[in-house]
Amino acid sequence: MLFVKERDIVVPGEKLAGNDYIAGRGTFIEEDKIYSSVVGLVSIKGKRIEVIPLQGKYIPKKNDSVIGKVVDVKFARWIVDIRSPYSAILPVSEVIDKGKKNLEEIFGIGDTLFLKIIEVDEVKKVKLGLHEGGPIKLEGGTLAYITPSKVPRVIGRKGSMIKMLKKLTNCEILLGQNGVIWVKGDKKMEEIVKRALEMIDREAHTSGLTDRVKEFIIRSIE
């Protein structure tokens, strides 16, 4: 007997299935029942059930800004990797330049895009759209990756951290709430920003972080 569905999000101790199923990774058995041992996403393959951990993964929400890479081009849509367990699509109907017949003339595989989540349906399929104004396709620069839950720390109180990063390095910086950050500027400065972001990700729980990051950047520039 199953107590959950494919792609359900579960928490530790949540009952998943009876003993007619095989316990996979991220699960444990107690009194002939299978339970989740982690926060994660249910995966059912035949009679095997497992839970894919979601730690560090991005759970999409409507109106979030995200940075993603085009991984496939299908009929009337692009498939975009947004660092989430859930698939994300950008329909051609959301794109301004509808006159082009070949979708790859607009966005091709490997292109990095700055997008907005328009909708997340009941089975967690993600529909993407464009921001009003601002860049869509991100040219050049480099990408940094942090834990999605640490993005507010990169912004800082009243934007203090992100303003400081931009001012000291003279880099363009765009934040995706999925933990993907685009940085464009002098190559040395791009690398300094990436290392500063790693520091923020690692030390987000500590106090006085903005001052320490500032000191690190100044030392690195000198």
UniProtKB/Swiss-Prot annotation:
Segments forming domain KH: 139-200
UniProt keyword RNA-binding, yes or no: yes
This protein's UniProt keywords: Cytoplasm, Exosome, RNA-binding
One GO cellular component, as annotated: cytoplasm
Molecular functions per Gene Ontology: poly(A) binding
Gene3D superfamilies linked to this entry: 2.40.50.100, K Homology domain, type 1, Nucleic acid-binding proteins
Assembly mode: Component of the archaeal exosome complex. Forms a trimer of Rrp4 and/or Csl4 subunits. The trimer associates with a hexameric ring-like arrangement composed of 3 Rrp41-Rrp42 heterodimers.
Descriptive protein name: Exosome complex component Rrp4
Protein source organism: Methanothermus fervidus (strain ATCC 43054 / DSM 2088 / JCM 10308 / V24 S)
